[in-house]
Structures are given as C-alpha cells and as structure tokens.
C-alpha cells in the first residue's frame, strides 16, 4: 500500500484536482463560506423501494411546442466560471450486489403513495385530504399550478437526438448558486449554462439529461472573457439575494413566503408567470438557424461538430439551454444527507393556533423540510405520513436533539407542480457535531460498502498457515535469493509492491518491480471476484481502512510481507546509465522480501545517515545484511532520479501542493495539523511504479487491442488554459501552454523566480490545476479508431494503465489477467510453432512485439484460448467495468476529501478560532477569495452589506479599502452583523492572548500552530490582488447546519 502522499502525486493530475467554492445561499442552514473541494458521481446503496429511482426515466408526457423566456430576460443571464466542469458521466452495472436495507428505514406507505411515475396515483391524494392533498394536486399537474414543463416523450427525445436538435449531457450544479447549472456534452469544450429552476426542469446533480440549446442571439457573454475593453473585475457581481430574485423572476417562478418557509401546502404558494398557466409548452423546437448555416459552410458534419464550430467562432459567448428530459436519474438522489428543519416546523405550528389545536399533534397532511448538507441540492419535502416511526415519535415529544441529527433521504417524486422534491427518510446517523456520525454519513452518501465480506466470498480464500504450492514453484521463476525489499508507510499492512536492483557488467542495472499476484487468488466469475468488483477500490480514512479484499488476502497471504514466500508478477528491466530500457522480462515469480522499510527509513539511507541498524529499524530476513539493503536503496534512488529527469524532459507535468497532516490523540480524535511535503523516497517508489504501469499498458494493448483496460488523461480545457495563460501574462509571467512539457518547463522557470514565495507557487499550481480534466479508465475497443485519445496528458505517454496495486484496486486485477493471458499465449504459440522457449516467450511480452506472430493463425488461436482461460472480458463487459471503476474511484476520492474537511472542521471546533495568514486570489466589490497555505484551501470572505463596515472598491486600480464605520448606516436595507466578516479584537486582548499562549501552550506539540504567530491588521486595511492578510478560521455548522469552514478578516481596533 502506498501512502496518500506517495500515490497521489500522479492522482492529483489524473483526477484534475478541481476546486469548488460555495456561494452563499439565502436559505436556512446554508453557510456563507465556501466548501472544501470535493468531487463527483456515486453508486448508491440498495434500500427498500429504491430500485425504481435508479432506472432510466422512462416516463414522459405528450409533447407540444415549448415557449422560451423573452430575449431581455435571457440576455440578463450571467454565467459562472465554476471549476467542476469536464466530469465524465458514470453509470453502475445493475448486476453488482447491493447492500441490504437498514431496518430503521422501512416505510410501507411510501411504496403505495410516493414511489410513483411522473404523476402519482390519484388514490394517494384521496387518502391525504386537506393541505397535503393540495400539494399532491399540484404534483398531479393541475394546469393552473404547473411550474415545470412536461418532459419530452422517449420518441421525441430519440428523434431530436438523431436530428441534432438536442444533446445528451451530464447535469452539474454550481455549489455557489444552485440557480446555475452546467451541462457537459461529450466532445464540446464549453459547458452549457442552464440558468434557473424552470430551465433545469427538475434535474438533479449528476443526472444524465437531454438539453435543447437556446438561439445564439440569446447566449450571454462568457464570464471572465477578456476583451480589449476593460473587463469587469471578478467579484463585482450583484449581491446574492438580488441574483436569486432575478433568477426566479427570469424563469417565471415566484415562490411566496408561505411555501418557502412555511410547512403547509398552500394553493397559492407557487405561481408561474413565464407562460400561459405558468407552464411553457413542451415539444422540441428546431435548433437555431446558425447551426444549419454553419453545416452548409462546412459540409456534412455532426451536431457536435456544428456546435464546436459555432463556439470557436464566438468564444466570448456562453451557450445556454434548457433541460427537456431526464434520461438517467443520478444515484445520488437516493442518498442525500442533511438536517430536518424541526424548529421551523414548530414555529409554523405555534404561530397560528387555527392550524392545530395542540402544537404537539402531528397531521399526516403536513410535512417537514430537509435541508441538504450539499448546497447543490434543493430543499426536500418529507411528508409526515412517510416518516419512520422513531423520528415521528421524537417529533411528537419535541425532542430538541432531533434537529441536530444527520439523516439521509431519497427523492421519490418531483411533480410538475411542486417547487421541491418529495422525499423519504432512509437513515439516521447521529449528531452532526460528532466525528463518527459524520464519517458514516460520508460513507453512506458515497455508497462505500463498509459491511462484512459475504460468506461466499470467503470460501475461496486459502487456509492459513499458507505455503506456496509445489506446482507453482515448478512453473514460476524463483527469485527468493534476490535482495527484494518493500518501501511503504510505517503503518501499512497491505504490501502489494516490492523492488530489487542488480548491477550488471558494462555499467547496466537490472531493476525489478514485483507486484502481489492477486489474480492467482481472485479467479474470474467467483463470489470473491464479484465482491471485489463491487467494492472496486479500498477506501483509506485517516484512522482506518475499508478494504476491497478480505484482510486474510490483503494483509496476509497476498501481501508481500518480509521473510515470507509470496507469489508475484514481476517485471525486470535492463537499464543503461541514461535510463534507457535495453531489455525486459515479464513473468510470474516467487519472491521473499528481506525487509519492510518505511519512507522515513529509506530517506535516511538516501541521506547517508549513519547507524541505520539502530533501535526502531525493521528486522532483516534471509542471508542479507544491512549493507545489501543500503546499497540497493541508494542505487534505486540514483536510477529513479535519472528516470524522473528523463520523464520530464519528455514532456511530463507535475502539479502538487503541500497538504496538512492531522495529529490524532490516543482515542483517534484529531487535535491539530502540521504541513508536510513528500520525500525523495516517495519519488523513488513512484518512478518505478510508473514505469511498470506503462510497460503493462504497452503489452496488453498490443496483445489484446480490443479488450484492454487502460487509463487516459485528456488534454486540459482549452478555454480555461488560455485564461490561465492570460492571467500569467497580465502579471508579467511567460507561460507556454502548447504542450504538457512546455507548460511544465515554463512553470518551473516561473517558480524558480519565486523560491522565496512558496505560497504564491502554491497559488500558481492551483490555477494550473483547474483546467485539467479527469483521468479515467477505458476499454481500448471503444476507441479503436481514435488511438490518439488513448494517451495520458500529464505523464506525456501514449499508453498507461494501473498494474501495481491489485490488493486495493480492481482494475489492476483485470490488467493482471490480461498480462497472464499474454504470457500463456506466448507459451502456447511456442509449442505450436515448435520454437525455442526463449524465442517464443519474447513474442508478445518482450521489448519488441512480434506483430506477425500475433496476426498469424497460430498466434490468434493462442491469444484467444489464453484470454478465455484467464477471463479477459469482452469489449462490452470491459466498458461497463471501466465505467463502474471510474465511478468508484471518484467516490473514494470524495470520501477522502470530505474526511479531510471533517477533520479540519473538528480541529477548528476545538480551537474555536485559528488565526493564520492568507493570500488574496480574487478581489471585487462584494467578496474576496483567499488561499490559506497552512491548510491548502480557498475561502471566500463577503464584506458587502456588513453593518459597521465600509468596503470601498476602486475599480481603476483593483484596490479594496476596508474601514470601520463609526456611525450607523442610513437608509433602508438588510445588513449583516460585522462578526460575519470580521473577527475584531482590541489591542489589549491581543497582548493578553499572547501572554496566555506563552503560559498554557502545549510544549509537547511544538509543531502545533498557536495564536501568537499571526498579528491582526488595523483599520483602514488596503487590499490588492495577492496581498497577504491575517484571517481567522472557524468551524461552521455541526448540530445547527452543514459543516463548513468559515473565514473572517482578523482586525484590531480600540473602538
């Protein structure tokens, strides 16, 4: 197992590292600070009655021509340059096993009344008279109460897609402003803006939708597009409450106070104003004539090509459109985590005695609102009659702790007449301010299976103690006399890779990478294989691991533990001093590791520290001595440095920032964090793992060009990359974006001039990461006519896959099987051709691939027989496996990011305040975005409409002057208290705090950050782009709202 730091250097580029920053919402519990970056697509758990919501949207209504909002309204729309576009669509294979339902969650009435099609069963409305019936009348589609237009029928969708009048896309919501959503169309470089609830037409984050584009004349200007005229600075947009109001008016929705904040279904609560009867008609109108004219100029081309041509001709325009159908519902609909608005319901009940004789009584025709923790989701309506009995009883008893409990819900219906989806509660986790409930909610939300392994999957495991069978000794290459060692984190137990090096005559080296042969134990189509495929990846939390494979395999018989005979897949390269591969050998082996080194141990050896065999160092096994180990580590370090330099000369790109490492007490509770960076020993291991992955990709793609699992990383988003280039040019930095290698070279030159400003280097890397797209697994058969798209942009190589971590990644097991099949095909071919074994064994896995042998009748037969024996999947099956593994890998990363945010929040909650320095990244009249280097996060600070604070924005010089008002503001308007933007202390308090810190500071934790390191600023404060300012971080939410990390200016004043 590799540590998060060692393994993620490539992953940081592969996964794009998209940052998402939340915009404040005017809703209950919605934080006004941005969130820690998380990313996206999930496979959800199986709960009672949830399968129906997983299926594609088959229900549709009759179509009629759809009317659009007027031109003035649409031209008023403004786009947002959010950083989470270019995310690949994902789907789960329905055949994979699901976890069993929680006994808490069953609600028999739901299946009868709520799990409906596009319109609910009228009988459900008859059983719920009064206010609840009025709501369901709206959902049923009363012509005077419709908000959303009917979705197109399946036939209309199919016809529009075939004619190029509509596009299939992935629906993503702006976390800063839920009224803004973006749709990613495959092959189109710019995302489509879907502005407003009506245009979004009940689509939810992660849905696969069909969209209809607006005419070109209605597309707004691209935000951030720089022209010769003075561009409007970022952050100068109107206040969010005004934006929200405009968005509702533009899209024909007026959500009155009774429904927005109340708890009854009022007949007049929602009034559509955009079209007749509040509904825009719904049949597919023709595409803008500009598409047709472009096609006439360019000849016969696809609709995507036409759209790309228009976007290229009008780069300053942001395309807009509307959702006309939801063709595949996102699985995240089934696991939305949030808090019940119990106080709001109680206030509603007590505010009018006519509604209820007693505030304690519950009526089935009422509902309670659920406020999602993720701001991308709308409020949910949970009818009382579908509440689990335990929650309903607590509501009746006015349990004050209920509102602090994290719950999960699934959307069961969203009718055309309801502004919010109807949901049911599926799980109760515990208090939102506690660590364990939050972790459980994170795992549940991302469908991470934390249950025990099934009995069937355990039956195929070998019994312990286990020894290598004699038949394997006979058929494998015996490397037990070779000095093989592992380098891993000190706490690692699943050791899936080992290294060796030998000096050869003539100054050559033979380097070996030995990977645990997991495919020997996990056979295709077994219960264990099904379980591993379902879990897909191990998930690493700070204090525990959720394994993909049972511990008996991942930590015992499959792990390359020191002193034990283990089965391995080995790749041996003969390298010269320039790092060129002269020859190679690939095969199944038996190895015996002589020691388990930690990264710190290996680094001490590289640094030449003496007395390496002192206390605390690992035991040696076999006949080897410490001089053998130290010589191997130093040689490997020198060779890896040569390989690394060569790789970057060939165009590789590396972008990474330092990240905090958490310190835990004996109870596993985080209490502080320190910053750490990767060591040379991390790069040592990384370099050889990259070489092994590239070698495996080359072999399997040549042997099985239609059914190999590779990993591709597309080129960055062109528009965003050009924006980054313009940003650097504006600030006097030359950036070459013509290739990954040129980008790396120019970044190194820029950062070389900034050696004394590591924070700005981090900011520059953050900007460089944002244009990067996600890396993903794919089946070569799906791109057989587009071999150029197989490449990996960040690594600058044409072929790449994952081979080196089969104990924790299912794709690696798939690759092992293909490699085993190629090896066996070589043996079969040599027997059929009656050639020498050395000549035959080199034809498919050697450094020179024998294409003639592979295309011969004997070669084809050998490859086919071997593929069948080792379970090499077909193109169709492998495509589904790739898509599912992409989804699970993304979910695992979300869990990791969410846990990082949770641990940070928990530390800040205990500290109460955390003063630190921040660097201003964006600046405007309403808010600034700051980068906190100690935590590697970005945060927004809003300072508009703050009582007692004056924020003067000087647009000509892009300067902000923040001062304190010493008289109350005149005029009307809502102003937030100063404490929301400024943490204000007096100079006397600062002196007292410093003295207290000196007396009570924990001397046992010298790495901990204390309050006396950062001094507050004074009024007036002048701020420009890249200014360093003091801020105070604090924990937001917990028991009373979603978790977040808030930032405020840290100021000092006597008044």
UniProtKB/Swiss-Prot annotation:
Main localization, broad class: cytoplasm
Keywords attached to this entry: Cytoplasm, Exonuclease, Hydrolase, Magnesium, Manganese, Metal-binding, Nuclease, RNA-binding
Pfam families (UniProt xref): OB_Dis3, RNB
Molecular function terms from GO: 3'-5'-RNA exonuclease activity; metal ion binding; RNA binding
Low complexity composition-biased segments: 97-108
Binding positions (Mg(2+)): 488, 497
Tissues and organs where the protein is expressed, per its UniProt entry: Widely expressed.
A GO CC annotation given for this chain: cytoplasm
GO biological process: nuclear-transcribed mRNA catabolic process; polyuridylation-dependent mRNA catabolic process
Record InterPro entries: Dis3_CSD2 (IPR041505), DIS3L2 (IPR028591), NA-bd_OB-fold (IPR012340), RNase_II/R (IPR001900), RNase_II/R_CS (IPR022966), RNR_Ribonuclease (IPR050180)
Basic residues bias (residue ranges): 17-32
EC number annotated for this UniProt entry: 3.1.13.-
Compartments where found: Cytoplasm; Cytoplasm, P-body
Biased composition (Basic and acidic residues): 39-59
Required cofactor names: Mg(2+); Mn(2+)
Sites annotated Important for catalytic activity: 496
Region annotated Disordered, chain positions: 1-109, 229-249
Keyword Hydrolase included in the entry's annotation: yes
Function of the protein: 3'-5'-exoribonuclease that specifically recognizes RNAs polyuridylated at their 3' end and mediates their degradation. Component of an exosome-independent RNA degradation pathway that mediates degradation of cytoplasmic mRNAs that have been deadenylated and subsequently uridylated at their 3'.
UniProt family annotation: Belongs to the RNR ribonuclease family. DIS3L2 subfamily.
Record-given protein name: DIS3-like exonuclease 2
Origin species: Arabidopsis thaliana (Mouse-ear cress)
């Amino acid at each position: 197992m590799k540590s998060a730091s060692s393994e993620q250097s490539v992953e940081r580029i592969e996964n794009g590292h998209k940052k998402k920053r939340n915009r404040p919402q005017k809703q209950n519990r919605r934080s006004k600070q941005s969130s820690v970056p998380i990313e996206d697509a999930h496979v959800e758990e199986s709960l009672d009655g949830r399968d129906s919501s997983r299926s594609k949207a088959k229900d549709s209504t009759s179509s009629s021509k759809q009317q659009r909002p007027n031109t003035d309204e649409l031209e008023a729309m403004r786009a947002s340059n959010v950083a989470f576009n270019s995310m690949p669509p994902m789907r789960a294979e329905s055949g994979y096993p699901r976890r069993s339902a929680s006994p808490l969650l069953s609600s028999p009435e739901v299946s009868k009344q709520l799990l409906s099609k596009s319109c609910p069963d009228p009988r459900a409305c008859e059983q719920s008279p009064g206010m609840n019936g009025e709501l369901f009348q709206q959902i049923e589609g009363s012509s005077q109460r419709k908000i959303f237009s009917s979705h197109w029928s399946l036939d209309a969708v199919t016809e529009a897609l075939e004619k190029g009048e509509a596009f299939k896309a992935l629906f993503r919501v702006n976390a800063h402003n839920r009224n803004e959503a973006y749709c990613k169309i495959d092959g189109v470089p710019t995302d489509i803006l879907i502005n407003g609830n009506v245009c979004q037409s009940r689509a939810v984050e992660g849905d696969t939708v069909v969209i209809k584009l607006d005419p070109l004349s209605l597309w707004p200007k691209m935000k951030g597009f720089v022209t010769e005229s003075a561009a409007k600075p970022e952050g100068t947009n109107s206040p969010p409450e005004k934006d929200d109001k405009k968005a509702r008016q533009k899209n024909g929705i007026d959500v009155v106070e009774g429904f927005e904040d109340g708890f009854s279904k009022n007949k007049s609560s929602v009034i559509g104003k955009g079209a007749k009867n509040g509904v825009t008609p719904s049949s597919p109108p023709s595409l803008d004539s500009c598409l047709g004219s472009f096609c006439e100029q360019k000849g016969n081309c696809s609709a995507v090509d036409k759209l790309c041509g228009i976007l290229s001709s009008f780069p300053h325009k942001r395309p807009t459109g509307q959702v006309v159908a939801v063709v595949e519902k996102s699985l995240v609909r089934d696991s939305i985590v949030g808090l019940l608005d119990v106080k709001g319901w109680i206030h509603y009940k007590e505010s009018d005695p006519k509604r209820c004789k007693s505030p304690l009584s519950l009526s089935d025709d009422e509902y309670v609102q659920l406020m999602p923790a993720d701001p991308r989701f709308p409020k949910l309506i949970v009818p009382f009659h579908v509440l689990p009995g335990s929650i309903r009883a607590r509501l009746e008893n006015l349990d004050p702790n209920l509102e602090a409990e994290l719950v999960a819900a699934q959307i069961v219906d969203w009718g055309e007449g309801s502004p919010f989806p109807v949901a049911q509660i599926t799980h109760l986790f515990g208090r939102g301010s506690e660590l364990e409930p939050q972790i459980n909610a994170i795992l549940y939300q991302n469908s991470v299976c934390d249950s025990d392994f099934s009995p069937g999957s355990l039956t195929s495991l070998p019994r312990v103690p286990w020894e290598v069978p004699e038949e394997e000794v006979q058929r494998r290459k015996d490397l037990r006399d070779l000095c093989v060692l592992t380098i891993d984190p000190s706490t690692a137990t699943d050791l899936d890779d080992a290294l060796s090096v030998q000096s050869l005559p003539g100054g050559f080296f033979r380097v070996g990478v030995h990977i645990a042969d997991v495919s020997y134990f996990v056979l295709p189509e077994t219960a264990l294989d099904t379980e591993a495929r379902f879990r897909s990846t191990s998930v690493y939390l700070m204090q525990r691991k959720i394994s993909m494979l049972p511990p008996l395999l991942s930590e015992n018989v499959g792990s390359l533990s020191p002193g034990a005979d283990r089965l391995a897949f080995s790749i041996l390269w003969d390298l010269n001093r320039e790092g060129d591969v002269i020859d190679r050998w690939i095969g199944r082996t038996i190895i015996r590791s002589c020691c388990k080194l930690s990264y710190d141990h290996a680094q001490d050896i590289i640094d030449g520290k003496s007395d390496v065999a002192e206390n605390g160092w690992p035991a040696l096994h076999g006949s080897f001595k410490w001089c053998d180990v130290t010589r191997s580590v130093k040689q490997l370090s020198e060779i890896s440095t040569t390989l690394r330099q060569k790789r970057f000369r060939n165009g590789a790109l590396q972008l990474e920032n330092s990240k905090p490492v958490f310190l835990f007490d004996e109870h596993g509770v985080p209490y502080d964090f320190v910053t750490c960076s990767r060591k040379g020993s991390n790069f040592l291991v990384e370099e050889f793992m990259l070489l092994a992955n590239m070698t495996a990709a080359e072999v399997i793609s040549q042997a099985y060009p239609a059914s190999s699992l590779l990993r591709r990383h597309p080129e960055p988003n062109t528009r965003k990359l050009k924006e980054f280039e313009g940003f650097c040019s504006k600030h006097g930095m030359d950036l070459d974006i013509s290739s990954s290698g040129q980008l790396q070279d120019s970044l190194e030159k820029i950062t070389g001039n900034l050696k004394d400003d590591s924070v700005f280097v981090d900011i520059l890397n953050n900007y460089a990461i944002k244009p990067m797209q996600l890396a993903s697994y794919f089946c070569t058969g799906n791109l057989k006519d587009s071999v150029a798209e197989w490449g990996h942009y960040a690594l600058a190589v044409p072929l790449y896959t994952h081979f080196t971590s089969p104990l924790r990644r299912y794709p690696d097991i798939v690759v092992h099987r293909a490699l085993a099949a190629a090896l066996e095909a070589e043996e079969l071919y040599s027997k059929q051709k009656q050639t020498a074994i050395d000549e035959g064994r080199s034809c498919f896995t050697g450094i020179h691939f024998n294409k003639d042998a592979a295309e011969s009748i004997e070669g084809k037969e050998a490859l086919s027989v071997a593929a069948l024996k080792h379970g090499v999947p077909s193109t169709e099956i492998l495509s589904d496996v790739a898509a599912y593994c992409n989804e699970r890998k993304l979910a695992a990363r979300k869990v990791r990011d969410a846990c990082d945010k949770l641990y940070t929040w928990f530390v800040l909650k205990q500290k109460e305040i955390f003063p630190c320095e921040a660097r201003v990244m964006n600046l405007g009249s309403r808010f600034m975005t700051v980068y906190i280097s100690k935590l590697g996060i970005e945060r927004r600070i809003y300072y508009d409409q703050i009582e007692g604070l004056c924020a003067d924005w000087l647009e000509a010089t892009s300067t902000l002057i923040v001062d304190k008002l010493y008289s109350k503001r005149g005029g009307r308007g809502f102003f937030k208290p100063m404490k929301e933007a400024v943490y204000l202390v007096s100079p006397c308090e600062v002196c007292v705090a410093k003295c207290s810190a000196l007396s009570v500071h924990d001397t046992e934790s010298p790495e901990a950050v204390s309050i006396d390191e950062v001094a507050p600023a004074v009024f007036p404060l002048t701020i420009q782009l890249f200014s360093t300012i003091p801020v105070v971080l604090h924990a937001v939410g917990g028991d009373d709202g979603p978790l977040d990390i808030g930032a405020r200016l840290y100021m000092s004043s006597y008044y």
